[in-house]
């Protein structure tokens, strides 16, 4: 089973700590969600894995081998990002042919099929594509290269709702037909919540959660009701956030829910992934504003 292991990786840009001693292992044939606020370190981590940026310390291993400046191992991964490395003067079809030279498993027929499905004009030059179709072009490349590990950094940037839904549908289909690992870094958390199997949450350059989506959602719940009753229930529990409106209060909790010992005035409900993410990544001063 192939793995990518990130070991004790740190990266600083002048005074900004982008990554702080990050360690995590990515397994094959999974769909991960890499979630974090702007500037949390998501893109830096993906750029280090793909050899576009070098860490200050630590290493990235593919099946135990160091990936840095190793072209043989780098062919096992593909990163789709906002930055383009293709000549603006080439058209889409020419880029498909060029990509085949670097990634022998690139499926040209599948790329053409997706182009038709998404309405991408393969005769257009890259510089002629709109923001949305530029993203679609990059997505088609990423879905067609057939690398064991594919990283998608803000994959649906500029896409309308119809194209986003189509992308998620195609992603699930290609994953089912040809299992491999996809890592989606996105802010559209609710849209991907039904797709991702494992969640990685990064905050201020550190991994704060890494577990299955199912397990994390099973831990999160809300308790609401009169402030005094909510406070009494939450005493000694892992409360990750709260909102107060007059005499009423909503608390966001992680852990085992115990309704048997709760005041009858309290209401319990599941915590959706987006709300859970927001509460886990709020800064202290932002959380205080909700008190």
Predicted regions and their residues:
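Conserved ABC transporter NBD signature motif
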Residues: 26, 58-73
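C-terminal coupling/interaction segments
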Residues: 241-291
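Walker A (P-loop) phosphate-binding loop of ABC-type ATPase nucleotide-binding domains
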Residues: 36-41
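Helix-to-loop junction immediately C-terminal to a conserved catalytic motif
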Residues: 50
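Short loop immediately C-terminal to the Walker-B catalytic DE motif
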Residues: 156-157
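ABC-family P-loop ATPase nucleotide-binding domains
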Residues: 72, 81-138
């Amino acid at each position: 089973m192939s793995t990518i292991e990130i070991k004790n990786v740190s990266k600083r840009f002048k005074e900004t700590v982008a990554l702080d001693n990050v360690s995590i292992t990515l397994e094959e044939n999974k769909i991960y969600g890499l979630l974090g606020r702007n500037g949390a370190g998501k893109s830096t981590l993906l750029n280090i894995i793909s050899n576009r940026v070098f860490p200050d310390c630590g290493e990235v291993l593919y099946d135990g081998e160091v990936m840095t400046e190793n072209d043989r191992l780098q062919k096992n991964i593909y990163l789709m990002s906002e930055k383009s490395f293709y000549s603006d003067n080439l058209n889409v079809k020419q880029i498909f042919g060029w990509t085949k030279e670097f990634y022998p498993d690139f499926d040209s027929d599948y790329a053409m099929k997706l182009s038709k499905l998404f309405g991408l004009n393969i005769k257009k030059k890259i510089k002629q594509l709109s923001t949305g179709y530029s993203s679609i072009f990059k997505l088609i490349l990423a879905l067609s290269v057939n690398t064991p590990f594919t990283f998608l950094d803000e994959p649906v940037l500029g896409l309308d709702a119809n194209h986003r839904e189509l992308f998620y549908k195609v992603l699930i289909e290609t994953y089912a037909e040809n299992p491999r690992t996809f890592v989606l870094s996105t802010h559209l958390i609710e849209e991907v919540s039904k797709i991702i199997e494992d969640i990685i949450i990064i905050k201020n350059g550190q991994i704060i959660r890494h577990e299955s989506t199912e397990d994390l959602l099973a831990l999160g719940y809300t308790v609401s009701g009169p402030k005094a009753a909510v406070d009494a229930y939450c005493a000694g529990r892992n409360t990750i956030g709260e909102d107060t409106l007059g005499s009423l209060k909503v608390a966001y909790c992680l852990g085992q829910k115990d309704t048997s010992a709760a005041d009858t005035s309290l209401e319990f409900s599941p915590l959706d992934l987006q709300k859970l993410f927001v509460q886990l990544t709020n800064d202290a001063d932002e959380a205080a504003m909700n008190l």
